Amino acid sequence: MKLLVLCIFAMMATLAMSRRWHYVPPKFLNKAFEVALKVQIIAGFDRTLVKWLRTHGGTLSHVQKKALYFVNRRYMQTHWANYMLWINKKTDALGRTPVVGDYTRLGAEIGRRIDMDYFYNFLKGRNMIPKYLPYMEEINRMRSADIPVKYMGK
């Protein structure tokens, strides 16, 4: 029982520190900046997926490959707020007002640096590629720029 309480307190402390000690109001992005980020992040993830499919995707069905493209988009949506924390640090360090090219460069860096190969191998190796459902088709059909994210631009 004591161990359970200790684990719960440790988890609460971890969550509190991951959210910072004080409230950090979100910075809203200009729509052009948001689009530049999304397009470059998805392009990087998709480029990685194409390379991975060329070497490891021979045994996957067409539907499973489409599900992996959905995984790319959902991964970006899930981690968008964390990307924004990193991007805010990088743009603040510029010492000037950021432009679309800065956000394009940062989005490309995120798309290139995140090791999605490991994630694809994990999903394939454990037979955990999600079943392809209609809502996945909707998101896959969207342009990269139109994929909804929680940290919305104006």
Swiss-Prot record:
- Gene Ontology CC terms, in alphabetical order: acrosomal lumen
Repeat as a keyword of this entry, yes or no, is no
In this entry, which stretches build a coiled coil? Answer: none
Q: What biological processes does GO assign it?
A: single fertilization
- Which keywords appear in this protein's UniProt record, sorted alphabetically? Fertilization, Signal
This molecule's function is given as: Dissolves the egg vitelline layer nonenzymatically during fertilization. It creates a hole of about 3 mu-m in diameter through which the sperm pass.
Q: How does it assemble?
A: Homodimer.
| Protein name per the record | Egg-lysin
Could you tell me which species this protein originates from?
Haliotis sorenseni
